UniProtKB/Swiss-Prot annotation:
The lineage of its organism: Bacteria, Bacillati, Cyanobacteriota, Cyanophyceae, Oscillatoriophycideae. [4Fe-4S] cluster binds at C96, C130. The keyword Protease does not apply. The modification ADP-ribosylarginine is found at R99. This is Nitrogenase iron protein.
Amino acid sequence: MRQIAFYGKGGIGKSTTSQNTLAGMAQAGNRIMIVGCDPKADSTRLILNCKAQVTVLHLAAERGAVEDLELSDVLLTGFENIKCVESGGPEPGVGCAGRGIITSINFLEEEGAYEDLDFVSYDVLGDVVCGGFAMPIREGKAQEIYIVTSGEMMAMYAANNIARGILKYAHTGGVRLGGLICNSRNVNKEIELIEELAERLNTQMIHFVPRSKQVQEAELRRQTVIQYSPEHPQAQEYRDLGDKIVNNTKLTIPTPIDNDELEELLINYGLLGSEEEYKKVMEADMAAQALTRGAK
């Protein structure tokens, strides 16, 4: 069994990309379980064709404790027999969102949910790789990380930040970077830009996912493109990405770059963001550094 994880900046299309890709992998005969590790709990809705799955933390709070739950309470089966679990998170401003991830994974392991699977996929928020969100990496659960990014400044900044988190645990937990997935935003020279970023991070751009209205049309019906329009070219893009993940042997220890090098890369491609966007990056960087200092 291989344990993979999809990380990416909020709003980059990480959950949509992962669900479409995993749907294609399941259709090819792989036995898959998705563990949603994003407080939005939107990691499984396209597989289950529903609004949002009830989370482990929500049910545990209702029942009194996670020990009072049965596996059947939190594990649902969706498209192509993909098993689905959402860990959930606390109310905004209260507690650590990583608590739900830790609680869920421990519960699933104890209840035997990981048996008879080819892939377990963790769908993880990745704006800041704090201790909780880094848990699948830190505890050696996820062995292959795929970062969903685009040619936009904030998405690339987040990808580099995630690479830093992977590097931190690469030597102790054995986690590796499997590649960057470029979820296109139709930015100028986007393929070349992400290929160069991947090279600097000591990885590969494993696939370029073109932008398509078909994705939104499928989402309106709470479906993946694989389910909604299996013959559409966009469905084949996700199948191709899934095949590349299945056959991927280029698993590396990343070499994150500093902010000056990232800025230089954006300038070289004529894509440096506005002053407002630059301020956001600096604020996010200071917040990330404060979190790192607080964790020591």
